[in-house]
Curated annotation (Swiss-Prot):
Belongs to the universal ribosomal protein uS2 family. It comes from Helicobacter pylori (strain ATCC 700392 / 26695) (Campylobacter pylori). The gene is rpsB. It comes from the Bacteria. Gene3D superfamilies: Glucose-6-phosphate isomerase like protein, domain 1, Helix hairpin bin. This is Small ribosomal subunit protein uS2. HAMAP family: Ribosomal_uS2_B. SUPFAM superfamilies: Ribosomal protein S2 (SSF52313). The keyword Ribonucleoprotein applies. Keywords: Ribonucleoprotein, Ribosomal protein. NCBIfam families: rpsB_bact. The keyword Transferase does not apply. The lineage of its organism: Bacteria, Pseudomonadati, Campylobacterota, Epsilonproteobacteria, Campylobacterales. Disulfide bonds: none annotated. One of its GO terms (molecular function) is structural constituent of ribosome. GO terms for biological process: translation.
Amino acid sequence: MVTMKDLLECGVHFGHQTRRWNPKTKKFIFGVRKNIHIIDLQKTLRYFRYTYNIVRDASAQGKSIMFVGTKKQANETLKEFAESIQVPYVNYRWLGGMLTNFSTIRKSVRKLEIIEEMENSGQIDLLTKKEKLMILRKKEKLDKYLGGVRHMKKIPDMIFVIDVAKEKIAVAEARKLHIPIVAPLDTNCDPDLVDYPIPGNDDAIRSIRLFCKEMSEAILEGRELMQEEIVHANENSEEIEYVSHEEKEEMLAEIQKEITQGAE
């Protein structure tokens, strides 16, 4: 689990310039240095560990968690960790309706799958050169926008967001559907938009990497707990012995005989 040393080394304590702050983050601010707000890492550590446990427990219950982060500093790191633990992610651009109009998104994903099926079967080679080029361009665009959510069969139970100030549409859709939001909370962000905030720098690459790493580890730990629970439940469950029809009839006859003899 994250330590104070990790937070310091990754620059999690550096907020934004004082003129860019959101006054609602005042309770998370330790002070000011060269017109930069410094985040109170004691509070960050406490919120980090609490949120880690929340994410771990959600994962242990089999809940799905989506990663969202489209800005330049975050997109490759977020994709790396999301793919390593096989969770859905959006790292290029959030398409409106990704959550609130999920059925339409699924139709677009199906288009991507159909194009791939055409490639695998060789059917695409029967098209004209121009048609083939158009379809491959379509595939490239769909994969860029939807590649991270192509295996997502339902809306997620929770989303982890890098930079809630930038990902306004994603945050608004999640809130509309009452999907809990986990996010680092920089000094320019609104704490009221985040269910499980972690006060910290959401701009520095090392800080972003730390957040992604810890959330990924929480999810993996949760999955391990779920597997242990399943194994434990199986070990403690008694094997059910089913009575055959013949045995059932024989037993009923014996009971009937005992009742008759008792009546005499």
